[in-house]
Amino acid sequence: MLLSKINSLAHLRAAPCSDLHATKLAPGKEKEPLESQYQVGPLLGSGGFGSVYSGIRVADNLPVAIKHVEKDRISDWGELPNGTRVPMEVVLLKKVSSGFSGVIRLLDWFERPDSFVLILERPEPVQDLFDFITERGALQEELARSFFWQVLEAVRHCHDCGVLHRDIKDENILIDLNRGELKLIDFGSGALLKDTVYTDFDGTRVYSPPEWIRYHRYHGRSAAVWSLGILLYDMVCGDIPFEHDEEIVRGQVFFRQRVSSECQHLIRWCLALRPSDRPTFEEIQNHPWMQDVLLPQETAEIHLHSLSPGPSK
């Protein structure tokens, strides 16, 4: 059954990663002005990352998200093959944006004197996973399994493309309420994936692994698995397991809801204190709890269409 589901879900991750050298996006300042191509709508959210507005592409009325990032807030920079210096977020998004539905797509970008503007796809109707859980409480395990599989596939896709997200959390996952598909968003804390140790971290602390809290060092893949464990706990219990550094370092997991023993086992495995004791992505997908995953459309029909959609974001 798992093999058939893998084959059915293959479209979510089978397409190749975007090739930076093959990209057809011209540098932002060589294109028509932003204002002539996009109509800017209401503010969707703001924070340390900048501000995100809803918008419409004038040419075809496509809904988009328009993200403004001030240059003086950008800590990590990258370079495109043509030598253009851009935020690392642009480099990472261009690597992961092609041929895969589980990661938000970068449609365009513009450089301004004091900022960069990123044009991103915007599904409708949509709600982030944080708001979804806040409104509806802990998820049924069948729904959590479908969501978790999709997030896992998105993270695997990123790693296959040489990208480490570094801020996997419920607020950075969008749910397309019509299609039952999830999308990983916000690569502002991301980095190029490497096998050596990382000594910097700009993600969300309560999702960070104990080795970062204790030693300010971590490896990308095992840290991602820890964050996935936090996320799965959040899905099935309705809240994260740890709030303080001491709790993260101690790593004792208590379940506040009735959760199956198989799901508990997977969560505890992902939250192993020793990074080398955590499962690989393949081991997670082969875990007994991960069998019989609903397809996204099945998820929408069974779990989402019967619910009144929350506010769009």
Curated annotation (Swiss-Prot):
Q: Where in this chain does the entry annotate a coiled-coil region?
A: none
SUPFAM superfamilies documented for this protein: Protein kinase-like (PK-like)
Catalytic-site annotation from UniProt? 167 (proton acceptor)
Entry EC no(s):
2.7.11.1
* Positions bearing Phosphothreonine: 23
Q: Which residues form the Protein kinase domain?
A: 38-290
| A Pfam family recorded for this sequence | Pkinase
Please give the residue positions where the record annotates the modification Phosphoserine.
8, 98, 261
Return the GO cellular component terms, semicolon-separated: cytoplasm; nucleus
Q: Which family does it belong to?
A: Belongs to the protein kinase superfamily. CAMK Ser/Thr protein kinase family. PIM subfamily.
* Name of the protein in its database record: Serine/threonine-protein kinase pim-1
**What is the species of this protein?**
Bos taurus (Bovine)
Q: What is the lineage of its organism?
A: Eukaryota, Metazoa, Chordata, Craniata, Vertebrata
